[in-house]
Each structure stands twice: as C-alpha cells, then as structure tokens.
From Swiss-Prot:
UniProt cross-references to Gene3D superfamilies, sorted A to Z: Immunoglobulins
Protein name: Leptin receptor
Main location: membrane
PANTHER family to which the protein is assigned, alphabetical: CYTOKINE RECEPTOR, LEPTIN RECEPTOR
Gene that encodes the chain: LEPR
Domain writeup: The cytoplasmic domain may be essential for intracellular signal transduction by activation of JAK tyrosine kinase and STATs.
Organism field: Homo sapiens
Amino acid sequence: MICQKFCVVLLHWEFIYVITAFNLSYPITPWRFKLSCMPPNSTYDYFLLPAGLSKNTSNSNGHYETAVEPKFNSSGTHFSNLSKTTFHCCFRSEQDRNCSLCADNIEGKTFVSTVNSLVFQQIDANWNIQCWLKGDLKLFICYVESLFKNLFRNYNYKVHLLYVLPEVLEDSPLVPQKGSFQMVHCNCSVHECCECLVPVPTAKLNDTLLMCLKITSGGVIFQSPLMSVQPINMVKPDPPLGLHMEITDDGNLKISWSSPPLVPFPLQYQVKYSENSTTVIREADKIVSATSLLVDSILPGSSYEVQVRGKRLDGPGIWSDWSTPRVFTTQDVIYFPPKILTSVGSNVSFHCIYKKENKIVPSKEIVWWMNLAEKIPQSQYDVVSDHVSKVTFFNLNETKPRGKFTYDAVYCCNEHECHHRYAELYVIDVNINISCETDGYLTKMTCRWSTSTIQSLAESTLQLRYHRSSLYCSDIPSIHPISEPKDCYLQSDGFYECIFQPIFLLSGYTMWIRINHSLGSLDSPPTCVLPDSVVKPLPPSSVKAEITINIGLLKISWEKPVFPENNLQFQIRYGLSGKEVQWKMYEVYDAKSKSVSLPVPDLCAVYAVQVRCKRLDGLGYWSNWSNPAYTVVMDIKVPMRGPEFWRIINGDTMKKEKNVTLLWKPLMKNDSLCSVQRYVINHHTSCNGTWSEDVGNHTKFTFLWTEQAHTVTVLAINSIGASVANFNLTFSWPMSKVNIVQSLSAYPLNSSCVIVSWILSPSDYKLMYFIIEWKNLNEDGEIKWLRISSSVKKYYIHDHFIPIEKYQFSLYPIFMEGVGKPKIINSFTQDDIEKHQSDAGLYVIVPVIISSSILLLGTLLISHQRMKKLFWEDVPNPKNCSWAQGLNFQKPETFEHLFIKHTASVTCGPLLLEPETISEDISVDTSWKNKDEMMPTTVVSLLSTTDLEKGSVCISDQFNSVNFSEAEGTEVTYEDESQRQPFVKYATLISNSKPSETGEEQGLINSSVTKCFSSKNSPLKDSFSNSSWEIEAQAFFILSDQHPNIISPHLTFSEGLDELLKLEGNFPEENNDKKSIYYLGVTSIKKRESGVLLTDKSRVSCPFPAPCLFTDIRVLQDSCSHFVENNINLGTSSKKTFASYMPQFQTCSTQTHKIMENKMCDLTV
C-alpha cells in the first residue's frame, strides 16, 4: 500500500516536472524572432545593439560590425585551463524588446555558452530565426541568419538543431536530457544563413516538438534555450497556382487562381495588383477567402499586374511566397461578355467599351453590326453609361455555319469604322428528343436520344440528367435544381442509350440533355416519362395459322403476354410466304379475343402470319412481331371442276369401231382445292350403258367407241371428294357430219403468234364452244389444242411457229349433241402471207428512210453552220450599227440606197469615228406674199399635207396656186390613179447658237413653220412648241410622197423620225413610172435665186420663186452635205434617188455668215 502511494506520488511529480519543463520552453511564433547571447554585466541598451556592437561603431553599408578583430584560440577545444565566461542567451520577437526566456547555468550547463576569448566579453551575438512547416506537410524548416555578416566568416561556423519527438518524451520520466535529443546538421551558405530540416511524420503534426539550436564557430559554442512548436500551426503553404485574368460578362476584371494542393485547412489570400492606363494609375492590396477577386471600372487599353499569396484562414500560419507576377492587358475594344452561348429563341445582350486614339468613344456614338454585313437597328441599342453601350438580340435563330465559322460575329463600331475585334454569338438548337421505353418484364427502362439535329461545338460534352419525382409527372415539366447524371453510351446507329434499372413504374422521371462548354451550359427542354406509360409489351405467344376445312378461311390464334396486365389490342399481318411478303394488316380491338378467321384468295398457298400487341388505351409502344407461323397446304374442299379434255380418234373410217384417246391437263391448285389424288372417267352410251373407270393420276385414257352416241365425263377426286362441275364430251356419228364452219384462215403475225379467224354458217344446233387444234406437219409432235368460247370469231394462238414449216389448223364446233365436222387447213393463208411480208418489208424500209432523212438533215444543218462560220465570221451584223437603225433590209430599195455608187466625185475629208447621221442647222423663213404667184404642179405636190379635216393649210386653189396662209379648213385635193398616199419626210436640225441669237432664230422658225401649218392641229406643232425648238435655231424639211388619207403623226423629233424612217423606201415598183419622187434642194444664199428642183422622170427644172416660197434660207454651219455646195439636185440617178449612209465621205466648204468649226455632216432623211 505504501509502495503504491509512493509510485503515484512519483508519477505525479514527474508529470509536474515535465509540464514545468515545457513551460520553460519558448513557443515559436509564426513570424520571425531573434536569438541573442549577451555577455555578463551588459546593459539593456547595449544589448539592443545589433550584434552587441558599441554605439559608435558602424560601416558605410549599414551593417554593424565589431571594431575589434576577434582573437580565437584555434589550437583546439580544450577548455580546462581557459577562463570561462557565462553568456546569457534568450529569445525575443521583433515586437517585444525584452527577452522572454534566458538560458542560465541551471540544471547543468545545457543552456550555458562558454568562450575562451576576450573578444566576446565585450560584445554579444544575435541571430534571426524563422520556422515553418513546408507545404507538403513533411518537413519542418528553421531558417537561421546571423546578424554578423563578417564575424564568423573566417572560422569554422556550424549550426546544429537538436529536437526531440513526442514519442521520446513519453518514454522519458524526467525533463529531456541531452542524450534524448536528435541532432540535424543545418546547411549554411557563405553569408552565415543556415537552413535546418526536421522530418515530421504526418501523424505527429498536431503534437508539440521541442528544439534547440547549437551554434559553433571556432572554439565558441552558443546554445539556445528550448523551443516548442506544433508543426500544424506553422504551415507555410505553397504559392497559389493557375493565376488567370479575364473580363466577366458584367465588364469586371476577374482574377482567379487555384489553391495549392495538400493543404489540410482552408486558406485566406492576399491579392495585390496594379493598374496602368493612359488615364489612371492605381495599386490595391486585398485579402479574400475565395479563390477569385473582381476588379471593377476596367478601362480599354489598360495593363494589370497581379500577385497572390496564401495563409491559413483560421488559426496561426505563415504567408506563402508570392506567386509569379501575371500581366493582363485589355484591348482597345472591350466586349463583355466576349462570347455567348445560347439556345434558339432566347434573348441575349452584349456590352462594349470602345477606345479610339487614346480616347474612349461616347456610348451614343457606338453602332453595332452583325458579320460586318448587317447593321443592327438602333431600336436594339441601350446606353448603359457614358462609355458603355449595349445591344440586345431577341428571339434568336440558330447560327448557320459559314465554313469553319460556327458563330456570328458581333462588331462594336464608331460610326462607320469598326475595330477588327468582335464578339462571338453561338446559337444552338437544343431541342433534343428523348424517347424511353419499358421492357415487357417491367424491370428496366431504356432511353435513347440523338444529337444529329443540333449543331456540334468543339470541346463540348453532352450529358443526360434526370430527377425522379415520388409519383406521376407534373403537367408542365421543368428542370429541377437537384438532378443526377446518367451514363449514356453511343450506339452504332448514332443514338445514345441510357438504361434505368431498377425503375419505379408510377414515378415521373424528368429528363433533359445538358450541353457543357467552356462558354457555359445549355439544357434541352425537359420531358417527363412515366415508366408505366411507355411499356413495350412482349409479343404474343403460341401463334398458329391454318386454313379451315370446308369453310376455306385463314384462322389465326395466339396467346396474350403475361405483362402488362392492361387490356391489349392486337395487330395481325399475313401474306403469301416468299422472299418478299406483301403483308396485309388486320386490327383486333377485343382484349379478350384470342383468334380470328380471315378470307384469303388462294386457299392452296402457304401463308405467313405474325401478331403483335399494344395497350388498348394507346399508351406505350407496339410489341415486336411474334415469330411467323405458316399454314400447311391440304385439301380444303372437293375440286371446283373437272379437267378440260379433248380426244384423238384413231381407226378405220369405214368401220363403226374407233379408238378414242382422251387428253386432259392436270388441274391447278385453285381448281383442285388443293390436290388431285386420281381421275375417274364416267361413260354413258346411247343404249343407256353407264360405267366408270379409275385412271389414277394419268392424263391420258383410251377407250373403244362402238355406239351411235357415247358421252364421257372426266372427274377429279381429292381427299374430300369428287369434283362437282365437270366437262362432258359426246361422240356421235350423225353429228360428226354437221358442218357449220364455212372458212378458216390462219395469219402468222410473227414466229410466236398466229391469228386464226373463221366464218360460220347458220345452224339449228346449240353451239357450246370451239376446239382449235394445230400441229406441225413436218414433225411427229403432239397435237396442241385450245378450248374457245362460242362467241369468238377470231383468236390469237401464242406458240412457237417456224415460218418454213407447214402447220395444220383444225376448228371443231362442239354441240350439245356431239362434235361437229371440223374445218381443216394445212398451211397459212397465202395472200395474207404476202401482204404481211410486204408489210414487214415496209416496216423495215420506212424507219430506215426516216432515220436517213434525219441524219441527212442534221448533216446539212451542221455543214451550214460551219460554212456560215467560215465565210461570215468577220462580217459584222449591220443591224447593230447606228446608221442601220430603223432600216428595213427586207426591201431591195434599202440595199440600192446603201450600195449604189455616187455619180459625183467625192472629195476626201477627215474620217469620223462613227457613221452617224449628223443633221445640219438650217433656218428657213418661208412665206408667199403674192397669192397670184403660180407654182408648178410638181411643187404643189411637194408641199402638200395630209391633214385635210383638221385644217392644215399649205395649198389653195387646186393645182393653180400655192399660198401659205393662217386660215384653217382649206381643202386640198390630189389626183392619183393609184391613190397612193404622199409620204412626208422631215429632219430636225439642232444648233449650237449662242443665247443672243436665240430670239432671231426662233423668229425664223415661227415665221416659216406657222405659215405652213395651222397653229391648232399642225402635225409638227407639238414638236416645235416645246424643248429645244424654242431655245435653239432649227429647221425642218418636208418631202411630199404621202397619200392624202394618212394623218401625220404628232410625234417628237426622235420618235417621229424613227417612224418615218420605218416607212422609208415604201415605194411601189408598179407606180414608179407614173409618179415622181420630189426632193427639196438647199443651196447657199448666193445661189438661192437660181436654184431649181428636178423631178425624177421628167427631168424638168422647177425654179423656186424667191419672193413667194422661201424668203430666207441660211446655213448656220460651215460644213454641210455635198449636194448643198455643188447642186440643189438630190440624186441624179436615172433610176432612183438615194440617200448616202456614210456621211464621213461628204464634205462642204460653203462659207456662210456664221462660221464655225469644220465638221462632217449629212443632210438625209
């Protein structure tokens, strides 16, 4: 008992002693602290000096150094004969100026430093110490830096760290002794900076670690007091990783990073960044607990430099090192968001800040474009701030890929100038159809979906997500915030397939497809599926098919599947068995029905039958078709009829006994229903003899005909019975002499068809049918025969016929009383053969002739085109020339005008570029003052007009005098045997007269025009009353060759001249010898009085009376037509006059009172 109490007291004392020892240790702080060893009798101020130097000792670089060169005993480490000086070593933090724990010579010399030099009796030693646990949580590091940079440089400077692990302390009953410490060597650099590494097990991170430092230099040893630390409280994390910056959708700069790995607790982060732009320079330092930081008010063209470090969020810890600096520069145009991924039908918005030439563009001046091809309406713009513009797109359509671009480019522009940067808009149709079906055992549900209907994006993934409700589906499916993913696998048909197992039949599964992309995620419209409503039942079982006996219906039976328990409807398909079955469908809506009978056309065929089912209420899917069931061919009924048969009679015609061989063809299945086991022949003679003979399966039978009349019947018998409807054939001696066939003809169409026709005579016997029989006379082949209706008079026999062979055709009339006398021919009808042969030759010759004609015509056309191309390739089309506009090349007069050689000599002149008609500017002032002046008849016709009813006055006193008057309604007559209408030709001439001369020229026009035509309905008044006629001096010429009945058209110059040119040359040949064509000659002023007018035929000179006809004729240009200079006669040809079409070969040197530049011109009409 006493021993037990002693042990308890001892243990309690040891525990108190150990606690006391821990309380004597210095708790290591997360920040840096200092170890100072002070010589005895040193004051506090002296102790605060770095390295214990005197107050007046310093050097130029700021470091304190001793003024006394230390004299160490380098002979060894024997301290027995040396004087011993005790240094007091203690720890103090940078914030605390007092020593928190000193090392005295207590309990031995563990914390006592000894020196053998007088140098350390005047100075002290100081070290900076910082300890931390490395980010990988495996090494505890203490960093020891001497504050004397040169004190220990030339001596053996060593630092050791002594530590004791927690498990060692548990085994020791006393305060840790020197032998219980483990020692690690610290790696020191040349600058007296040492790093000590202590391995710490992961399981001991929360335990207390005891340490002390032992510093040796030469013969001096410094030892620190005990230090205690919990490694988990001294963790120094690794710097944050993945520093990244981007502009958010809201226009902020987002700084994001990742936490360092293997950190057992959350961290806080310190972010420092600087912004440098043309307008703002700022720095910031913020501490956050998240792994991101938003910086607002960013500006285009700015540079941001960012660094981040981390530290334990709750509890003590050490800041990590700063991360590597990251620089981010904004562009001159900032889009936020820069990219948008959205679905069809949604509304999205882009924001923009535009910087141009170091100035931010006001938001009101920003315009938006789509793909640089479509300007977005201003109604979609919004001004967010002075510099931020916003555009919104409504009800978006799917983006159409353009080559490798799968997005629309949205440009932010300043008026009409756009920056090359743009925002990207991705619009995807996410309408994905998800279909599910529950298997027939109600144990699993399979869902399928395809992405073929949506546009695929690079680096995008698709995932099916679902949410299961407790019971049924909601009326409007919606995406639930809590959902689960489902693994789906791509199948060979391009569909993804997902399997839900187990399932809850009455739970609603809401599903949607989520498209995950770096730009965001999109969800397809959700759909809700109830497994019980999408059941695909098992196919019906025990399906059988058969043809019922004596009824002849297709009977189909089946068994309902076990699941589901709902009422089912059934669908049956059946058809003739073969490679490609032509199915017929039949629906059965009676849930209790298990069989059905259907009519089929062919009772003797094999039918394939399949059945499937579905819920009667329409929910779910049709099951798969059952395995096919086949009918078995068997006799259903007795044969529908007996076989058709014919006979061959052999024997002496003089005798009454003949051998008759019956021939028949085997019955088909449709007639035998469905097989024939044997044939039976019934005999009936005129002596009432009746008997039957079984011939088995043979199709030939011979019997002896001895009676006057013998009737035979062939019956077909199957497993059901004998045929009911049978054919009878009576052999009668009297009837064999009845002849009703007058003629028989056989016409071969080709080698496979012969037409047989016949003519019958009237008969009192009832004709039943005909038998046509034919055979090749050159061969011993069998006789072929056909049964033909009695109403037919012509029949086509289809067989293989050889034209050079002879064939015998026989036609037998069959009566109720017996077989009549046949009509037999031994060859084809000759006349018809020749006709058909000639027709056949015609059939060959005509196509040959037609083909040859077509080939010859094609050859001629090709040759014509080649010849035309060869000879006329370089000849231009005259209709495309300006001088040929309006000319009718269908008339020979046109070509004579074009190509008759000019009789007068032509002088050379400068060549015009285009052969166009250039009218001359001639002013004409005409009047007849003397009414008594007489004018030749030819001149009368020259000035006659055609508007007799509207009052155009140019002529009075029929054929007696000519007078220009302003009176209206004067009658003009014109005698012409052919009543040919005169033709009025005129030309308008445009001048370049100066404005000062306009009045004079206009007066000339008015005086000349208005005196000849009435002011009311003149045919040329409209042309002269407007446009340039009132501004420039112009003139017109009239040539009379028009019928009196034609009304002169009211046209402008350009229209009227075209119309008149179309009528040019319409001079009937038969009237040329009766009527002359008159032309107006224009001459210069000097030759005006001697001017004459020549007719085409009479060659009579008709002088123009100057005072009565033309009072003034002035040529206003220096150049004019050749005939103006030399002669007033236009055309001296003995046949016909002509108008030159090439004005560049006509010159004129006539001098007038108005001289202008020399020009080529032509006065033609």
